[in-house]
Regions:
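Conserved class I S-adenosyl-L-methionine
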Residues: 49-57, 149-171
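Class I SAM-dependent methyltransferase SAM/SAH-binding core
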Residues: 60-107
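Conserved alpha-helix/loop element of class I SAM-dependent methyltransferases that forms part
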Residues: 27-49, 64
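Short alpha-helix
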Residues: 179-197
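A short glycine-rich, Lys/Arg-flanked "PGG" loop and its adjoining helix->strand segment in the class I
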Residues: 132-147
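A short acidic, Gly/Pro-enriched loop at the edge of an enzyme's catalytic core
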Residues: 110-119
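Core SAM-dependent methyltransferase catalytic element
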Residues: 196, 202-248
């Protein structure tokens, strides 16, 4: 297939990202090539690292991690908006070893998905009705000491508020997008990640593209997560807590 034929074939699909398929062939993505990857803080060298890309869409970040030497990359999505054709097309043309996983974030389970050194959760959180549950699910698929990268819209008005705030959007208030449910402030993102089992949370890119922010979080050890859950149960039920920890 010539370069022109490849461009024509790629043009049949909807692309959010511009993915370089060959030196002279880039998919016609809405967001532009490499539009935001520089602010995500993804390590340049991923040699030996396992990666889970949650909400991968057309696979841009999954393929990029593969290029950076990741040992294993799993690309997870439900592909409900525009289907999986664009992902499959790029996967084939790049001769990629990325593993597609058709799963809702709410259904992610380490028993079948595994646990990973690096989990990407980019441009997904604010689209979900249940963001804390989603963070708990991706944290469960992160190895102890592993890194979670979250890219999300934030609430600008409460950006400097140290109290966690999350604005609910029942309609199309944000960028005329009815799929945006929430705008958390940075404190809310950090505290939700902490409640999901992360020890360290860093706001690595405080603001880009007007209302977006990037966070890195380090997953606690299994023992630390167990102790946190135990203490949280006691704290939240301290008035009625008389017996042993459930299951003990």
């Amino acid at each position: 297939m010539t370069d022109n034929e490849l461009r024509e074939a790629a043009g049949q699909f909807f692309w959010w990202h511009s993915i370089r398929l060959r030196d002279n062939v880039v998919t016609p993505g809405i967001s532009g090539e490499n539009a935001a990857i520089s602010v995500m803080g993804i390590p340049d060298d991923l040699t030996g690292v396992s990666v889970l890309d949650v909400g991968c869409w057309d696979g841009y970040y999954s393929f990029e991690c593969e290029k950076r030497g990741a040992d294993r990359v799993v690309a997870s999505d439900i592909w409900e908006t525009s289907g999986r054709d664009a992902f499959d097309f790029a996967h084939h043309e790049l001769d990629s070893k990325v593993e597609p996983l058709e799963s809702s974030v709410y259904d992610l389970d380490p028993d079948y998905a595994g646990r990973f050194d690096l989990v990407l959760f980019l441009g997904v959180l604010y689209h979900l009705k249940h963001p804390l549950l989603a963070l708990e699910k991706i944290a469960s698929c992160t190895k102890p000491g592993g890194r979670i990268i979250v890219d999300t819209i934030i609430d600008i008005k409460s950006q400097l508020n140290l109290q966690p705030v999350m604005i609910f959007h029942p309609g199309s208030e944000v960028s005329d997008d009815p799929t945006t449910w929430w705008s958390p402030n940075p404190a809310a993102v950090a505290m939700m990640l902490g409640a999901s089992g992360c020890l360290e949370v860093t706001n690595v890119t405080r603001l880009y593209s007007g209302n977006r922010s990037v966070f890195h979080a380090i997953k606690a050890s299994d023992a630390e997560c167990e102790e946190r859950a135990r203490q949280e149960y006691k704290d939240r039920h301290r008035q009625i807590f008389y017996g042993p920890w459930p299951g003990k």
